[in-house]
Amino acid sequence: VTFHTTRWTLVRHATGRSAVGRQALSDLCAAYYEPVVAFLRREGRAEDAARELAHEFFRKLLEKPALEGAAPALGRFRSYLLGALKHFLARERERSGRQKRGGDAVSVSLDAGTDTSPGLVLADSYELPPDEFFDRQWALAVLDRAFAALAGEREAAGKTEDFARLKPWLTGDAAHGDQAATARALGISEGALKVAVHRLRRRFRELLKAEIAQTLDSPEAMAEEMRHLFAALGGS
């Protein structure tokens, strides 16, 4: 990954109404729409109400000319998005009625193809403090996107069926004793199956790092961000 051209770097260095920066921010918002909805639902909102408010939040976020005045240390889109969401909610609570949009507002919305279906939510997630809850939903979204990218690669290579059989070793759903049966189904030895699983895991990790990199502005932050997200998944 070239950190000079990650989506978050393009956003951070955009000036005014830079088309490149605005598109990069729109892409990031579309990618991480679901953690925002989950955060809003955690506060007791119904599904439809949370999604409507999420769209309003992203609309306002995308109308900003640029991240003017953003703290230099804000090198993670995750941190920026959560801070912006908290600020938005504080403003919403202060309003006694709906604020009318200005006539000079530029309307920018999420792409029509944005997946707004419910994402992964761990059963006990609502028991976490708000920030930790958001980070866990964020981590789940990162994993989901990396997994989807891997599935897309296998489909493009004509390996959809093989991937479906190997998938349990990525998700942790493979039961003891499944290895021999899977090897027979694929027509390979158990040794070859172990190699295939190892390669698949390695590729998944590469795609995971690539996905995380798009939300950072420096390679130095990668190791820390990965540790943070895995800790969020573990609840520790």
Label for each model-derived stretch:
Residues 1-236:
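Intrinsic, short, N-terminal disordered tails of RNA polymerase sigma-factor systems
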